[in-house]
């Protein structure tokens, strides 16, 4: 109770699995884990899970991996992440700029802060890009930027949760003039 004013607990619900090479890509892509790739079933199951969790009063957080699937689940997401492998991706930065929830951008897989800081700067600004509508048509999207983008320290070659690493991160964020 003493931390209620400072912390909001959310449930991490990740439906997509980032892969360095190959392997199962997650519930949305292959819900039966049998290479049938029934993405329609996966999306419907993902939405059901999100509805069930939010109906319990628990906000949900997820990593946005595929730039198309957020169109079908973002209305049920309270917080999102852009992963270390996609932090430098232009399409993910554009996506982050248009989402209606706070977006954390992870530092690079090596631990480098620059990909995340550059991602935050990009997400804070408006973008124009092609994507799909909910009915599957290609459309041009214009975003207004996401001022609630922030860094996620996920480690790298070494841990980065210590006070010295956090201070270096804060200094780098101030120098880059981002949240």
Enumerate the predicted regions with their spans.
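Short acidic catalytic loops
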Residues: 1, 178-179
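Active-site-facing alpha/beta catalytic cores
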Residues: 3-175
């Amino acid at each position: 109770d003493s931390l209620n004013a400072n912390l909001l607990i959310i449930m991490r619900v990740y439906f997509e699995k980032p892969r360095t090479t190959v392997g199962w890509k997650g519930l949305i892509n292959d819900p039966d884990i049998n290479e049938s790739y029934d993405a329609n079933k996966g999306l419907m199951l993902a939405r059901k899970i999100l509805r069930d969790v939010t109906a319990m009063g628990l906000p949900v957080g997820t990593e946005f991996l595929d730039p198309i699937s957020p169109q079908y689940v973002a209305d049920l997401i309270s917080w999102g992440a852009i992963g270390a492998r996609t932090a430098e991706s232009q399409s993910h930065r554009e996506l982050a700029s248009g989402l209606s929830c706070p977006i954390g951008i992870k530092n690079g897989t090596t631990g480098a802060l620059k990909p995340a800081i550059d991602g935050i700067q990009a997400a804070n600004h408006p973008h124009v890009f092609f994507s799909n509508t909910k009915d599957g048509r290609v459309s041009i999207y214009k975003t207004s930027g996401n001022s609630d983008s922030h860094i996620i320290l996920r480690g790298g070659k070494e841990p980065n949760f210590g006070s010295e690493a956090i201070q270096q991160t804060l200094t780098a964020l101030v120098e880059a003039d981002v949240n």
